[in-house]
Amino acid sequence: MAEFDVTIEILSPIHLSSGRADVNVDAEIVHDALGFPYFPAKRFKGLLYESAVEVLEMFELSRLDAENLSPLEKIFHRHSTSEVQLIVPNFYILPAEKYQAFCAEWKYLQGVYPEIFTPTEILNSYTSLRYQTKLENGIAAEGSLHNLRVLDAGTKFFGKITLLNADKKVLNVLALAIKNLTAAGMKRNRGFGRIKCTANIPFPQFLFKEA
């Protein structure tokens, strides 16, 4: 078994949709019961798979030898199973061991001062609302104004991924996929969702071998 610390840094406003809305927000982001945003495990794993596919495509287009990279099916089990297991947690604003104590303190404060330390106020401190509308002939279309909540740039998320029965080729794929993962969430083509991912996985040395 091997464990690796992963950090996700938000470089531009990002919308990680929860699929929910209310009278004030048309598109809400994921957050916990206390109001703190987090990066869902399933979403990160899906993005990691997409990034790994891109890595293999880049190797193919560049005519680089991919023999040091593990087949993706061995890691992500899209259509089959294998002994390799990739365990991905939710990513929180603090490492897991610190986040639990942090949440316990906030629960206490919310219990003692419920009118001050509300989930909404906490969420607002990490986020902002963006408004958009549809234009028709240069004029805003009636009823087209809506908003979405975005997580502000500068936020960092922390998590620890676990690998079972992994070999060097699996580690190579993960290291490259994490390095290549630079976008998440909605409206990526409009400047939203830029991220930087880092992990304490050794970078593949075969890439630096002389030809």
PLM features: residue spans?
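RNA-binding basic/glycine-rich loop and surface signature characteristic of RAMP-family CRISPR effectors
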Residues: 1-126, 140-211
